[in-house]
Amino acid sequence: MSELTHFDAKGNAWMVDITEKEETHRVAEVRGEVVMAPATLELIQQGGMAKGDVLGVARVAGIMAAKSTPNLIPMAHPIMITGVNIDFQILPPDRVEIRGLVKTGGKTGVEMEALTAVSVAALTIYDMCKAVDKGMMIQNIRLVSKSGGKSGDFMREGESQWEK
């Protein structure tokens, strides 16, 4: 396992200096899901939630969250994000899977931005549906793949191709 990069020799937290790192094309894909009562999923699909278009608002929230990551994660660098896609799969009878894909051409990866995007999209779904279903669960938020950078590529075993 690699050494932790956000601590100096004395154990003090610090922001990694990326000044000399090479700019490369970087992509991170993260997935997660919100599990809910089947009736809640039906309301989402039918556009019947009182707060409006649940998935549309969650998509915008996820995009905004990716761009706000350095304000939330102390050691995350403010970077030029070149693309954010938030997609959803309805998985009857009781869940919505969320996929966040974040891209940059920079000196550091976008894993934290993708994780933040999916997390906030899931929280937004919860917020918009909690009036009818307080038992929803946000779960299984994970990095599926990343490419670019010094540490190389990563692909989680056992993940299926995203179906749109």
Curated annotation (Swiss-Prot):
It catalyses: (8S)-3',8-cyclo-7,8-dihydroguanosine 5'-triphosphate = cyclic pyranopterin phosphate + diphosphate. It comes from the Bacteria. CDD domains: MoaC_PE. It is an enzyme of class 4 (lyase). The active site is at D127. SUPFAM superfamilies: Molybdenum cofactor biosynthesis protein C, MoaC. The keyword Transport does not apply. Belongs to the MoaC family. This is Cyclic pyranopterin monophosphate synthase. It comes from Desulforamulus reducens (strain ATCC BAA-1160 / DSM 100696 / MI-1). The gene is moaC.
